[in-house]
Amino acid sequence: MVIIKPMIVQVHQSGYRLDYILSKLLPQYSRSQIKHWILNKKVVVNNQVSTLPRKKVVYGELIEIKYINNNDICKSEDIVPQNIPLNIIYEDNDILVINKASNMVVHPGIGHYQGTVLNALLYRYPSILKISKQAGIVQRLDKDTTGLMIIAKTVSAYDNLLRSFKLRKVVKEYDAIVYGKFTSNAGVVNQPMRRHFAKRTFMSVHYTGKSAVTYYSVVEEFKAHSRVRINLKTGRTHQIRVHMAYINHPLVGDQKYKGNFSVFDIKKMSDELNNYLLDFNRQALHACTLQLLHPITQVQMKWNAPLPQDILQLIAILKKY
């Protein structure tokens, strides 16, 4: 068991989020790891368990972290460089753009200590952890979402990219295959999101959440499914998956959010199609376009990544019926 000394909130820390303050007090641990501890009742504030990462701390409060096992910890210095192939789309002295494969976590965390994008980056760029705790990673894609990611290779590029994302100056477009057909060719989902009250690894639409805006347009329609192009104004965790499920068009293969849509309009499907959909083992989501000003040269940059083979095969089968 790892013992972490109790901490007292100082005057200048009062009013900040619990997860933020802990990430500053414990820089050797990632923020996602700290959130994991909070959500799993490992953090105690003034003798009361706190399960809200967004809880605002107050001057003088005592923060304790209890019962942390060695298996629950992944420190930055423990991340192992691994010779893992990366599909590099673009690279210069300041940035790197990759086309992430499916079944690949971006950053090590609970249950995923190896085989991540960061493990691969450390192998190619051993000093990249000096840029930040996130090792130059300024955006994330879900484990099973494929497509474009930009990574900073210098501190200046990292800071400028973070600023661009915060100011929403980065264009991110996605291709998705969803259940159902739409009544209009384009639309917007403007619904706030927050962590689910009961299912703590889920996100949900809720009026107390943070602003989340998703634009979509129909690219292609099939008998009981659609291919849509999605543009994000905000970048909340699982935003596309949650918003599309909210409007009753969940992503094909999304085991987490599609609910009962595994049998959506099953009468319209052949056995071959139905079996293929049931076996499609990831959300059909691909980050296809990334556009921004280069963080150092300020030149307009744009990258496109073609659809991966599994989604192309899915589209081919959908076209047959």
Swiss-Prot record:
Residues forming the catalytic site: 142
Which transformation does this protein catalyse, written as a reaction?
Answer: uridine(1911/1915/1917) in 23S rRNA = pseudouridine(1911/1915/1917) in 23S rRNA
Matching PROSITE patterns, A to Z?
A: PSI_RLU (PS01129), S4 (PS50889)
What SUPFAM superfamilies has UniProt attached to this entry? Alpha-L RNA-binding motif, Pseudouridine synthase
- State a single Pfam family of this protein: PseudoU_synth_2
Q: Which GO terms describe its molecular function?
A: 23S rRNA pseudouridine(1911/1915/1917) synthase activity; RNA binding
Any one Gene Ontology BP term: enzyme-directed rRNA pseudouridine synthesis
- Which InterPro entries would you find in this protein's record? PsdUridine_synth_cat_dom_sf, PsdUridine_synth_RluA-like_CS, PsdUridine_synth_RluC/D, PsdUridine_synth_RsuA/RluA, RluA_PseudoU_synthase, S4_RNA-bd, S4_RNA-bd_sf
Stated EC number for the protein is 5.4.99.23
Q: Which domain of life is it from?
A: Bacteria
- Domain S4 RNA-binding residues, every copy: 16-93
Q: Where in the cell is it found?
A: Cytoplasm
Keywords (alphabetical) are: Cytoplasm, Isomerase, RNA-binding, rRNA processing
> Which Gene Ontology cellular component terms are annotated?
cytoplasm
Cystine pairings recorded for this chain: none
Primary localisation category: cytoplasm
Q: Record's Gene3D superfamilies?
A: Pseudouridine synthase, RNA-binding S4 domain
Q: Which PANTHER family does the record cross-reference, listed alphabetically?
A: MITOCHONDRIAL RNA PSEUDOURIDINE SYNTHASE, RIBOSOMAL LARGE SUBUNIT PSEUDOURIDINE SYNTHASE D
Concerning NCBIfam families, the annotation shows:
PRK11180.1 (NF008385), rluA_subfam (TIGR00005)
What function does this protein fulfil?
Responsible for synthesis of pseudouridine from uracil at positions 1911, 1915 and 1917 in 23S ribosomal RNA.
Which family is annotated?
Belongs to the pseudouridine synthase RluA family.
Protein name, UniProt field: Ribosomal large subunit pseudouridine synthase D
Identify the species of origin.
Blochmanniella floridana
